[in-house]
């Protein structure tokens, strides 16, 4: 009887990279985490993915799945296990021009998607970074520059093909395996490896995009006015406020209001954006008409040894004033973290709460803090961050999985309210009762 490794070499048609081989050093780590896996598999077909999953299960090895490799907890690598790197399954195809249906491989990045769709005048509500993978972002939500108009990335998903823990290929949609389709949209990589995503794209023109900056001393009034404006602004406007950017002066850093207006009409854009310009003393304003693909930034790979401590939570309308007050105070403190306040609402909030496993539909804002540096620096900053989040805790809800640097049980509890978690457990038990897929914010099967 052949061993799992022998069967892998027989059935797997892609690259098998092991320690000591030429590509291993460049392939063993993800963007935010280093690892030393025993096998790195680069499938060239869905059959290869199935063979890789069966191998990991049969050999009893930890399994990690890598798309873009951008997860802050480092889900895209491990020590001593198997990494399935989907980078060769990166096709982007417009399969139905009339209905704007797009099929995307599980290893594609959002930069590639935007570039391929641009000549067709189409785009998909995605994230804001070119090198981020379609899979990791979509399976947890997908909050980007079109979120208020077209919803989360996962709200534009109509079907997926998934390799489950037994190596089977399963299609999930509203009509086929709807329990899995519900869970996939927000439940992360808990249920299998998505080899193909089917999205509805939307017509797009060039967009008005850029940054308007104000003095740090005006943070409180600018943030309050910004939120008030967003409550009545057209949903074509999505915006992010950055406070206390350590790379731009920390407490002295200008408040950065990033805006994206989905449309190329100058009058409509001015109607949406000019009220923000009137919120305070404008230091800089580089808003201009740009191709949508150019709104996505290049994702930088940090130097070895740099760690990121990222936390997030959602803010309901009733708590916005107090949260913004705390954010402004923290931003003015001696050594603040990077703080971002992202607008959501709009199309996101029109989806029923229980329609997907992404749970926090009623939120008006999302708050994110981030600290980066060598491990000792990040460790030293943790008590201050804990204190900040202690102040925020009574006024915020949940967490967004894509902006969490850890994956402990309390993180999972924050991402999924009890009823959502209960439903996810049932789906996990059906499709992965042995919990093969643990490289995620893990749902434990009952």
Predicted segments, located by residue:
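Soluble FAD-dependent oxygen oxidases
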Residues: 1-446
């Amino acid at each position: 009887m052949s061993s799992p490794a022998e069967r892998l070499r027989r059935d797997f048609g892609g690259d098998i990279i092991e320690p000591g081989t030429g590509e291993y050093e460049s392939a063993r780590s993800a963007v935010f985490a280093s690892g030393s896996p025993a096998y790195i598999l680069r499938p060239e077909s869905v059959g290869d993915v199935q063979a890789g999953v069966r191998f990991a299960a049969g050999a009893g090895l930890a399994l990690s799945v890598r798309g873009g490799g951008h997860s802050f907890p480092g889900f895209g690598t491990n020590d001593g296990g198997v990494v399935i790197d989907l980078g060769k399954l990166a096709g982007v195809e417009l399969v139905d021009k009339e209905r704007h249906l797009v099929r995307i491989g599980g290893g594609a990045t959002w930069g590639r998607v935007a570039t391929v769709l641009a000549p067709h005048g189409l785009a998909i509500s995605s994230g804001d970074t070119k090198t981020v993978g379609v899979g990791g972002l979509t399976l947890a939500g997908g909050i980007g520059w079109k979120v208020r108009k077209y919803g989360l990335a996962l709200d534009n998903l109509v079907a997926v093909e998934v390799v489950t823990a037994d190596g089977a290929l399963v299609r999930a949609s509203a009509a086929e395996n709807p329990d899995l389709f519900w869970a996939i949209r927000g439940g992360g990589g808990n249920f299998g490896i998505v080899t193909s995503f089917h999205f509805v794209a939307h017509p797009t023109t060039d967009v008005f995009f850029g940054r308007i900056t104000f003095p740090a001393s005006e943070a409180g009034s600018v943030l309050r006015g910004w939120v008030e404006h967003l409550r009545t602004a057209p949903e074509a406007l999505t915006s992010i406020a950055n406070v206390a950017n350590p790379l731009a002066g920390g407490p002295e850093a200008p408040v950065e209001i990033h805006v994206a207006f989905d449309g190329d009409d100058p009058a409509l854009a001015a109607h949406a954006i000019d009220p923000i310009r009137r919120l305070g003393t404008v230091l800089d304003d580089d808003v201009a008409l740009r191709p949508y693909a150019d709104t996505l930034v290049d994702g930088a790979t940090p130097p070895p040894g740099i760690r990121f401590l990222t936390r997030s939570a959602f803010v309901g309308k009733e708590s916005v004033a107090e949260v913004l007050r705390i954010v402004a105070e923290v931003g003015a403190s001696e050594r603040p973290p990077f703080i971002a306040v992202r607008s959501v609402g709009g199309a996101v909030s029109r989806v029923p709460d229980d329609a997907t496993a992404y749970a926090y539909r009623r939120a008006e804002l999302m708050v994110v803090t981030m600290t980066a540096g060598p491990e000792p620096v990040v460790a030293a900053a943790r008590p201050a961050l804990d204190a900040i989040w202690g102040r925020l805790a009574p006024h915020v809800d949940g967490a967004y999985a894509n902006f969490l640097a850890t994956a402990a049980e309390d993180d999972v509890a924050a991402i999924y309210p009890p009823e959502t978690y209960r439903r996810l457990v049932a789906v996990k038990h059906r499709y992965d009762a042995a919990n093969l897929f643990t490289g995620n914010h893990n749902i434990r099967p009952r």
